[in-house]
Curated annotation (Swiss-Prot):
Residues 1-26 form the signal peptide. One of its GO terms (cellular component) is host cell membrane. The chain crosses the membrane at residues 197-217. The gene is K8.1. It comes from Human herpesvirus 8 type P (isolate GK18) (HHV-8). Residues 77-113 are annotated as: Disordered. The keyword 4Fe-4S does not apply. It comes from the Viruses. Residues 78-97 have a biased composition (Polar residues). This is Protein K8.1.
Length: 228
């Protein structure tokens, strides 16, 4: 193998190695189930935080501009002008009586321990919608340490028409998510995943830098002896 072939094949091999690392990382089930992803929504991009483990499905994004789920925190974006109100249903599937007292956000002021709760946000304010949703979900979630069992919270978000009833296309649930929350265990997984990501990114940057230097830095060529 000539020196010219070696100089040509080394950058190609480095590039193939970088692509293989990226492909393995993207297809690894352990990472794929934790990291989340960028996904096109009704308008703009939806970022699902990779620190939360979830199983999400989008059927209809007509009423929400963006929906983001991070653990048990749900942040709803601006509703569309056609269906300005957002209906959120939260179901806590943990063992009965294991959670804290849930506060009814509908305005009755009564404290109860429901398994399923439903609330309609009559607002177009992103901040108000987010705060109300966080308050509702916090009533089910509480705070957990590493020794406590995991619990599952199912969250459904759907648009509501002006008259307060679902009609037409709004009958379809645009966002359905299931997330298992155990704070201590998740924190351990998150730290491990971040470490693996940092190592992978460092290796990728190093290989890319070597490739750039190899291709861009001029090489000193030895002069051939002059033969008379």
């Amino acid at each position: 193998m000539s020196s010219t072939q070696i100089r040509t094949e080394i950058p190609v091999a480095l590039l193939i190695l970088c692509l293989c690392l990226v492909a393995c990382h993207a297809n690894c089930p352990t990472y794929r189930s934790h990291l989340g992803f960028w996904q096109e929504g009704w308008s703009g991009q939806v970022y699902q935080d990779w620190l939360g483990r979830m199983n999400c499905s989008y059927e209809n994004m007509t009423a929400l501009e963006a929906v983001s789920l991070n653990g048990t925190r749900l942040a709803a974006g601006s509703p569309s002008s056609e269906y300005p109100n957002v209906s959120v249903s939260v179901e806590d599937t943990s063992a009965s009586g294991s959670g804290e007292d849930a506060i009814d956000e509908s305005g009755s002021g009564e404290e109860e321990r429901p398994v399923t709760s439903h609330v309609t946000f009559m607002t177009q304010s992103v901040q108000a919608t987010t705060e109300l949703t966080d308050a509702l979900i916090s009533a089910f979630s509480g705070s957990y340490s590493s020794g406590e069992p995991s619990r599952t919270t199912r969250i459904r978000v759907s648009p509501v028409a002006e008259n307060g009833r679902n009609s037409g296309a709004s009958n379809r649930v645009p966002f359905s998510a299931t997330t298992t929350t155990t704070r201590g265990r998740d924190a351990h997984y998150n730290a491990e995943i971040r470490t693996h990501l940092y190592i992978l990114w460092a290796v990728g940057l190093l290989l890319g830098l070597v490739l750039i230097l190899y291709l861009c830095v001029p090489r000193c060529r030895r002069k051939k002896p002059y033969i008379v």
